[in-house]
Amino acid sequence: MNTKFPITAKGFKKLEHELKHLKHVERKKISEDIAEAREHGDLSENAEYEAAREKQAFIEGRIKELEDMTARAEIIDICKLSGDNIKFGATVTLIDDDTEEEVTYVIVGEYEADITKKRVSIASPIAKALIGKSVGDFVEVITPKGLKSYEVVTVEYKELDL
C-alpha cells in the first residue's frame, strides 16, 4: 500500500521512537531470550523457546508495520496551519444542539486518534462531517446513538499534547 496518510509531527516522532526502540532494544532482548531458551535442550517441547519465537514474530511484524507507516507518512506541522475552515490538525469546539453541552475535538491521523483525549481520526464520521466547515456552521453526524447536530463555535490550530 503506497497511500500517504496525514500525521502530526509529534505523532510521527512517536512512531519513530517506537520503531527505534523495537529495533535497538526489543530485537536484541528477544534474540538473547531465544539463545537462552535454546540452551534448555529439546526445542520441540521447549515452551520458553516457542514463546520467545512468537514474541520475535510479533516484534518483527510491528517493525515492518512501523517502517511502512513512517515511509508513507505525510507530516503536517499544525502550528503552521491557520484559517477559519476546519482541516486536519484543527482543534474544534462544538455545541451539541440537543444538550447545549460544549465539546472539543482535535482532528488527527488515524494512528494518533484517542477518543479519551478527544482526538478523533480524520477518517471518523465526526471529522468527515467537520472538514471544510467554519465557525457558525452546523453539522450533522450519524453516531451509534443516532443523529447528532452540532454548531461549530471555534476553530484553532495549536500544538498538540500527545
UniProtKB/Swiss-Prot annotation:
GO terms, biological process: DNA-templated transcription elongation; regulation of DNA-templated transcription elongation
Cross-referenced Pfam families: GreA_GreB, GreA_GreB_N
Keyword terms, alphabetized: Coiled coil, DNA-binding, Transcription, Transcription regulation
GO molecular function, one term: RNA polymerase binding
Record-linked InterPro entries: GreA/GreB_C_sf (IPR036953), TF_GreA/GreB_CS (IPR018151), Tscrpt_elong_fac_GreA (IPR006359), Tscrpt_elong_fac_GreA/B (IPR028624), Tscrpt_elong_fac_GreA/B_C (IPR001437), Tscrpt_elong_fac_GreA/B_fam (IPR023459), Tscrpt_elong_fac_GreA/B_N (IPR022691), Tscrpt_elong_fac_GreA/B_N_sf (IPR036805)
HAMAP family in the cross-refs: GreA_GreB
Its job: Necessary for efficient RNA polymerase transcription elongation past template-encoded arresting sites. The arresting sites in DNA have the property of trapping a certain fraction of elongating RNA polymerases that pass through, resulting in locked ternary complexes. Cleavage of the nascent transcript by cleavage factors such as GreA or GreB allows the resumption of elongation from the new 3'terminus. GreA releases sequences of 2 to 3 nucleotides.
Family indicated by similarity: Belongs to the GreA/GreB family.
UniProt-recorded name of the protein: Transcription elongation factor GreA
The organism of origin for this protein: Rickettsia typhi (strain ATCC VR-144 / Wilmington)
Lineage per the UniProt record: Bacteria, Pseudomonadati, Pseudomonadota, Alphaproteobacteria, Rickettsiales
Gene of this entry: greA
